[in-house]
Structures are given as C-alpha cells and as structure tokens.
C-alpha cells in the first residue's frame, strides 16, 4: 500500500496498482475472472461516517440549515438531490441529508453490478439501517455497526448496540443469514423476507432494521446524482 495521490478517496490514501503486490485493479474494468463462480455478499451501513456524531451542531439541525448545506455541496443539482433523497428516504430527518453515506454505497453498488453481469455466481446486497440507542442515539447506523449483529455478539457489545430485545432479535436473524451464506452461498434465513439476488437491473438489497425488508433500486436516482460529484464529505 502506497501513498502517492493525495486526492485518492476521502482519507487521502489508497492501494496503488504496482504490478507486484497488486498486479491489477480488482474491479476495473470488470470483476475478476478467477472468482467468477464464487458467490458474494456485500453491503454498507446507512450512515457510515455519521457526520453528526463528530459535528454536534448537526444533531438537531433545522431542515432549512440542512438544505442550505446541501445547496453548498451540490450547487445547481441541489433540487435534484433533495427530490431524489425524499424519494429514497421519504421519512427522513434533516440530519439524514448530511449523515447518509455516499462514500461506500456508490462503489459497493458498482462492484456488485460488475460481479452480477458476469453471471457466474449470485450477488447478495444489503444495507444496515438499524440505529443504535446508545449515547442518546448519537452513533446511528455508523461504520461497522452491523458487525456485532453478524456474529450475534449483540449483548457482549452492548456498549455499541444497547443490548436490548430489538437488537438481540435482529442479531439472531442476521447471524443466521451470514452462517447460511458461509455454508451454502445463500443467505436466506428464517425470520427474514426472501432475499433475492442482486442484478444490475433490479438493484435488490436486504434492508436490515427492526422491520427487515427487500428494496429494489430504492436509491438509484440519488446515487446517479452522487456519482457526478467527487467523493468527499461535507
């Protein structure tokens, strides 16, 4: 891993194709042929970096001020962004405009599409949207929040999950899905809706929350707008 291009990703560093350790970009221009027949499950959390966690002023931001920040970020596409956001997340709070992840989600979608068009093995996509109640809800569904649920360590990691009944119930469902995927390549599990495979056309994903559901291309218009901007946070 090398630091050569300060514009790479949000952290200013990224792996570099050096012809030795990393001989090629794994998903450019297509998914790797060597893993064509291996099923993949991939996903993100809804909020990932959760701007309001480390920017307290955003936690109770008014809709007017949130929209003002959106206009600063998206300029003449702000109205398109706001309309697409409301379509994808109709019950959103003002801070959601600033907390929702647009760094990992677009790249994960692209990786899923490249894998799916190979038609060699299924792709299963997820979005983890459950919000932790700890620290007065400050963490929301932040980066790595799904991990205690995947391994069913919800109670052991109560400092992150709260360890309540709803969290435990979700942990049972998610850990079963991950175990099934590890065993069979198919994550369908008791207590969850039918988990359809992701395709470039259907944009199918399992939306994990207290009420789990399948969504199809729910944020397509929103992500299409995001793709026209550099990958940077507010």
Per-region residue spans from a language model:
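Mature extracytoplasmic/periplasmic domains
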Residues: 112, 179, 188-215
């Amino acid at each position: 891993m090398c630091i050569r291009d300060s514009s790479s990703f949000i952290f200013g560093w990224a792996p570099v194709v050096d012809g030795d350790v990393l001989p090629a970009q794994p998903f450019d221009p297509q998914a790797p042929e060597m893993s064509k027949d291996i099923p993949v499950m991939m996903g993100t959390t809804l909020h990932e970096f959760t701007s309001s966690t480390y920017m307290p002023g955003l936690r109770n931001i008014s809709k007017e001020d949130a929209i003002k920040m959106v206009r600063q970020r998206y300029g003449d596409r702000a109205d398109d962004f706001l309309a697409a956001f409301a379509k994808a997340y109709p019950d959103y709070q003002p801070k959601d405009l600033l907390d929702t992840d647009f760094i990992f989600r677009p790249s994960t979608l692209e990786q899923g599409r490249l894998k799916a068009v190979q038609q060699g093995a299924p792709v299963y996509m997820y979005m983890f949207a459950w919000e932790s109640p700890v620290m007065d809800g400050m963490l929301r569904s932040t980066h790595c929040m799904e991990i205690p649920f995947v391994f069913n360590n919800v109670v052991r990691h109560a400092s992150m999950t709260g360890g309540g009944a709803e969290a435990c119930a979700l942990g049972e469902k998610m850990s079963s899905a991950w175990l099934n995927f590890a065993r069979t390549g198919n994550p369908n599990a008791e207590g969850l809706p039918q988990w359809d495979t992701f395709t470039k056309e259907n944009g199918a994903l399992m939306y994990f929350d207290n009420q789990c559901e399948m969504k199809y291309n729910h944020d397509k218009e929103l992500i299409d707008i995001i793709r026209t901007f550099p990958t940077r946070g507010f």
